[in-house]
């Protein structure tokens, strides 16, 4: 009898352990996870007669800070964390210039991305495009500092647009006709650099997938 009892105890103990692990997985493993977005600058430069010369190192640092702030503000309230990590599933680099690979002739664009549902995505944003556009759309009375800030906003907003393509690769976000939206198809507009932007048709799609868990959950 003792020989039969001992294996029975071991079997029951294994069942209890397996049940405990399953309960832990249900309680914790099924919780929505944070989505990491990698965002960083490669070496970039810009010079303009309107600015009176090239951008200084301190101005480039400010532009990066403002761009990161734009991304964080756009995705506030969602399970998204922005960092300079380069090993994230979703990532964007700011580079000097971006040419549209669909054309044989050089066509400069604000950015481009590729993404696949469930796998992530990667993309680039053109610093030259954002900086040049900020200069073009700046009103006559604006000073250098205001234009530098506009460059930061433009870079960040282009990154938000490209991240949206990666996060929602099948969503027709370019269908938006709201010029003050993140989804608008063109960065060649004054709203990209001056004033506030808002979400349009992508917002409910992003919230359905990335809404933050309730406080205390």
State what each model feature region is:
Residues 41-43, 86, 187:
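A mature extracytoplasmic/lumenal domain signature
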Residues 147-217:
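The catalytic-center signature of Zn2+-dependent metalloproteases
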Residues 36-40, 93-95, 182-184:
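Soluble periplasmic/extracytoplasmic beta-strand elements of cell-envelope proteins
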